[in-house]
Swiss-Prot record:
Posttranslational mods: Methylated by RKM1 at 2 different sites, but it is unclear which are the 2 methylated residues among Lys-40, Lys-106 and/or Lys-110.
Function of the protein: Component of the ribosome, a large ribonucleoprotein complex responsible for the synthesis of proteins in the cell. The small ribosomal subunit (SSU) binds messenger RNAs (mRNAs) and translates the encoded message by selecting cognate aminoacyl-transfer RNA (tRNA) molecules. The large subunit (LSU) contains the ribosomal catalytic site termed the peptidyl transferase center (PTC), which catalyzes the formation of peptide bonds, thereby polymerizing the amino acids delivered by tRNAs into a polypeptide chain.
Organism name: Saccharomyces cerevisiae (strain ATCC 204508 / S288c)
Cellular compartments annotated: Cytoplasm
Ribosomal protein recorded as keyword: yes
Assembly, per entry: Component of the large ribosomal subunit (LSU). Mature yeast ribosomes consist of a small (40S) and a large (60S) subunit. The 40S small subunit contains 1 molecule of ribosomal RNA (18S rRNA) and 33 different proteins (encoded by 57 genes). The large 60S subunit contains 3 rRNA molecules (25S, 5.8S and 5S rRNA) and 46 different proteins (encoded by 81 genes).
UniProt feature coiled coil, ranges: none
A Pfam family of this chain: Ribosomal_L14
A single Gene Ontology CC term: cytosol
N-acetylserine PTM sites in chain numbering: 2
InterPro entries for this protein: Ribosomal_uL14, Ribosomal_uL14_CS, Ribosomal_uL14_sf
Protein name (record): Large ribosomal subunit protein uL14A
Record PTM N6,N6-dimethyllysine, positions in chain: 106, 110
Transport listed as a keyword: no
Length: 137
């Protein structure tokens, strides 16, 4: 789950993005959408599909976008998920789409800006994502 650039620990969040899910790319790197092929740090039950949630680092490929970004495996961080989850204070919330940003293994973003809101859980865990985001919810 957490790479070199992650800080702190994460409260359990409902897993909303299994391997094979396609999410929007929320940064200005030139990618349009990302296809999840693996979840970092996901140890799970035998034969269970690994799944990611808000703030997780995943390995992804670009399905639509600039040709130089396509057909390569790269790390990405999930910044929004459509599956509802519960915060420690009892509030349930969810976003209208699934979105992620392309990063390097240390958690530094490839793009320089994030479009749309970013979950607080993700911003707390990844400082570089928090500094590039406009709205943290």
């Amino acid at each position: 789950m957490s790479g070199n650039g992650a800080q702190g620990t994460k409260f359990r969040i409902s897993l909303g993005l299994p391997v094979g899910a396609i999410m929007n790319c929320a940064d200005n790197s030139g990618a349009r959408n990302l296809y999840i092929i693996a979840v970092k740090g996901s140890g799970s039950r035998l034969n269970r599909l690994p799944a990611a949630s808000l703030g997780d680092m995943v390995m992804a490929t670009v399905k639509k976008g600039k040709p130089e970004l396509r057909k390569k495996v790269m790390p990405a961080i999930v910044v929004r998920q459509a599956k509802s989850w519960r915060r420690r204070d009892g509030v349930f919330l969810y976003f209208e789409d699934n979105a992620g940003v392309i990063a390097n293994p240390k958690g530094e973003m490839k793009g320089s800006a994030i479009t749309g809101p970013v979950g607080k859980e993700c911003a707390d865990l990844w400082p570089r994502v928090a500094s590039n985001s406009g709205v943290v919810v």
